[in-house]
């Protein structure tokens, strides 16, 4: 569960940086 949460968090951060 923790691993999945970390993966989603990193994915969200990457999308945010890509959008900016």
UniProtKB/Swiss-Prot annotation:
Lineage, top ranks: Bacteria, Pseudomonadati, Pseudomonadota, Gammaproteobacteria, Vibrionales
Sequence similarity: Belongs to the bacterial flagellin family.
Function: Flagellin is the subunit protein which polymerizes to form the filaments of bacterial flagella.
Subcellular compartments: Secreted; Bacterial flagellum
Keyword Secreted: yes
The entry's keywords: Bacterial flagellum, Secreted
Protein's UniProt name: Flagellin
The keyword Secreted appears for this protein: yes
GO cellular component, one term: bacterial-type flagellum
Source organism of the structure: Vibrio alginolyticus
